[in-house]
Regions:
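A general "terminal functional-core" signal
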Residues: 1-142
């Protein structure tokens, strides 16, 4: 990982595990000066969405209590959507909207609302457009 030794970057990942490439365990927390600046939340396939959202909210709360970002970058993995043929986390559009809202509220408090979002995954073209649209709408909301 590019920033694993950098204490100026906090890296958070919530993802299906085990999954390719096999990294992202809870024990991976950074390296050298960056130790403690990585938080992985590995989830088993089909983890109930309520548990995923609880884990997400808890992780963001933990990060916000010890790290004050200048900017938040979201690398949105929409392959966690329930309609996606690849992932098996089964999140719905409303789950992505709620998680986006949590990050946006943190950004509003911590870094004047500065958020960049890029798309990382999502392979069902029938659902992807609406999911991305809902995510972007939430980012744009006041």
């Amino acid at each position: 990982m590019l920033f694993r030794s950098d204490p100026t970057v906090f890296y958070f990942s919530m993802h299906q595990y085990p999954w390719y490439p096999g990294t992202g365990t809870r024990g991976e927390t950074g390296h050298r000066r960056g130790l403690g600046y990585t938080l992985n939340v590995p989830l088993r396939a089909t983890t109930p969405t309520v548990d995923q959202r609880r884990a997400f909210d808890s992780a963001i709360g933990e990060i916000a209590s010890k790290f004050s970002p200048d900017l938040i970058i979201i690398s949105a993995g929409f392959d966690a959507h329930k309609g996606d043929p690849l992932g098996q986390l089964l999140l719905g559009d409303e789950d992505f909207v709620q998680m986006t809202r949590v990050v946006k509220e943190w950004a509003d408090e911590a870094c004047a609302g500065r958020v960049i979002s890029c798309m990382e995954g999502g392979y069902n073209l029938d659902t992807l457009g609406e999911t991305v649209r809902a995510h972007v709408r939430e980012l744009q909301s006041c």
